[in-house]
């Protein structure tokens, strides 16, 4: 293991010796690469220890400590009054996982880049780490990120990482607030449960968890963890969830971007970083809209991320799933507005992909085999489409299109028109 401060010395050295410094002025040299815009379609993968119960959502680790939830009830029934998340972590043994099988399915979907979650809010790293023992190499003997990276390379798919480390500061605080017998009260497993910091709920907007300020030690932890993720995985892209929009993260975000862009310069390629809620300067990274759309053509390429499942990003039993048609029209709408579409899959805890999601992926691939010319390497036309159905917000991606709704894309000498409502919706 290595200390946070020791690791951050390496980060400072890379920035000192690199092209990019940790200022917005220096980072504005960055340009979003054409390879990303031309890809237009990628996949997100939510899979980890939180997949084991298959209850509610990938937020099970938090919800299991929140009274009056299905996850709380499941915990009491299956783990006991003082049951803890460590018991779930120890049950994660995906004996049916096969990276090459995933890569084959993803390749057939027509996606060009794949982004497995590298660390979700639960704090479990899906790769080898020298900063925290709670990683899958220590837990299962597998570096799942490395295995997937190698499998994707064989298929010509670019490998991305997703980090949700920032939220671990408070994610499991219900263990301390609501379960007197939880081991989260002690220090033995502090590196698993995290700080469990509580909110001032009177200052927190619903769904934002912003009634709290991240302390310096956590900001350093986030930066070191993010840079280690880069170093150990060498991804082409990195996605951060929403909570880094807190103002105290700003200088650490700049350091991360400078580090990542400099390291990729060393490795010979230009990467992408995704952000939400205005936490990065426009042009220095790619703006992301979760489960939503915009209502105009964006000057800079942007990203929409959404899931095949309607109620969760991770696998849950009795979930409902979107149709291939619904996913295809979402892809079309995003691309017509100069966006790239990131569609999520939530494999089961055993490492298999459920039939419902596999069917959507393969059907999309069949559609793209016919229509991909109008998607890959396309540009927006002078207008994105016709009709009245449009949205300009997140968390609302279930539009019902009429036979008057069309979307357009463009290549030199060719305009592609997509009818957004069809009689056969498979």
Over which residues does each language-model region extend?
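Mature catalytic domains of secreted/periplasmic carbohydrate-active enzymes
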Residues: 1-426
């Amino acid at each position: 293991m290595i200390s946070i401060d020791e690791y951050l010395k390496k980060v400072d050295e890379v920035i000192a010796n690199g092209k990019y410094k940790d200022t917005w002025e220096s980072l504005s040299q960055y340009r979003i690469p054409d390879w990303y815009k031309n890809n237009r379609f990628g996949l997100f993968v939510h899979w980890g220890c939180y997949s084991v119960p298959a209850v509610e959502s990938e937020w099970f680790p938090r919800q299991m400590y929140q009274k009056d939830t299905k996850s709380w009830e499941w915990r009491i029934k299956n783990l006991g009054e003082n049951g803890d998340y460590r018991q779930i972590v120890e049950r994660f043994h995906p004996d049916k996982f096969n990276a090459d099988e995933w890569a084959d399915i993803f390749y057939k979907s027509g996606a060009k880049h794949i982004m497995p979650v590298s660390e979700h809010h639960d704090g479990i790293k899906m790769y080898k780490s020298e900063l925290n023992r709670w990683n899958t190499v220590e837990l299962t003997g597998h570096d799942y990120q490395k295995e997937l990276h190698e499998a994707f390379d064989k298929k010509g798919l670019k490998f991305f990482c997703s980090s949700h480390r920032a939220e671990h500061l408070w994610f499991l605080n219900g263990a301390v607030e609501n379960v007197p017998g939880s081991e989260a009260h002690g220090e033995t497993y502090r590196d698993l449960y995290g700080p469990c910091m509580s909110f001032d709920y009177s200052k927190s907007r619903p769904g934002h968890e912003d009634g709290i300020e991240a302390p310096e030690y956590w900001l350093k932890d986030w930066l070191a963890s993010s840079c280690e993720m880069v170093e150990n995985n060498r991804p082409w892209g990195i996605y951060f969830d929403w909570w880094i929009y807190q103002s105290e993260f700003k200088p650490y975000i700049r350091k991360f971007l400078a580090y990542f862009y400099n390291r990729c310069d060393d490795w010979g390629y230009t990467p992408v970083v995704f952000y939400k809620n205005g936490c990065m300067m426009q042009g220095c990274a790619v703006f992301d809209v979760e489960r939503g759309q915009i209502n105009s053509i964006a000057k800079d390429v942007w990203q929409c991320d959404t899931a095949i499942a309607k109620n969760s990003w991770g696998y849950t039993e009795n979930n409902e799933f979107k149709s291939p048609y619904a996913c295809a029209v979402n892809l079309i709408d995003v691309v017509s507005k100069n966006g790239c579409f990131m569609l999520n899959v939530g494999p089961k805890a055993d490492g298999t992909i459920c039939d419902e999601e596999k069917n959507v992926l393969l059907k999309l691939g069949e559609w793209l085999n016919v229509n991909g010319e109008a998607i890959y390497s396309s540009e927006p036309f002078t207008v994105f489409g016709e009709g009245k159905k449009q949205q300009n917000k997140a968390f609302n991606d279930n539009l019902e299109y009429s036979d008057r709704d069309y979307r357009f894309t463009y290549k030199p000498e060719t305009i592609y028109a997509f009818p957004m409502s069809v009689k056969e919706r498979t």
